[in-house]
Amino acid sequence: MFFDASVLVQCTNAQAPDKMGRARSLVAHATLTGSAMVSAAGLADLYQRLVAEQAVPPDRAQALVLACADWQVVPVDSALLRAGMDLAGLFRLPLCDAITVQAAIQAGASTLYADHLQHGQRWGGLTLVNPFLGPAGSR
């Protein structure tokens, strides 16, 4: 279960309780089963979003990010950057999203949870899932 920062940030979004509950449930399940994965770039993005968008105090944001850092974290190296740029060019994705997709593929994830990419899109064995669509939480 690979997480994009767009889903993780919803864990603190009291303005959208359905999304917050769904995100927390996914994170709890992934953490308990040891299947939680994220990229180092995603952790940096999460910190920025928590502080800037959710007004989470920096020390609290750091604690939340470091809790996620205990998961399987995919580092962004030159090979991942190159693969991300190739994917971005091929599919006209923003580079940060392409790096997330490539990190999930590199980690061997079967599911990438993100709320802004095309739900159901597949790249090999990886499927993009918007966890906030459908009965578990509408957009």
Short names for language-model regions:
Residues M1-V38, E53-D59, P135-R139:
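Short, well-structured N-terminal submotif of metal-dependent ribonuclease cores
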Residues D4, D45, D97, D115-H116:
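Acidic active-site catalytic centers that drive phospho-/nucleotidyl reactions
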Residues S39-A41, V76, P131:
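Conserved beta-strand termini and adjacent loop/short-helix elements that scaffold enzyme active sites
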Residues D45-Q72:
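Active-site-proximal, substrate-binding regions of enzyme catalytic domains
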Residues W71-Y113:
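Active-site neighborhoods of divalent-metal-dependent phosphate/nucleic-acid chemistry enzymes
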Residues V101-R139:
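Acidic, PIN/NYN-like endoribonuclease modules and their adjacent C-terminal/linker elements
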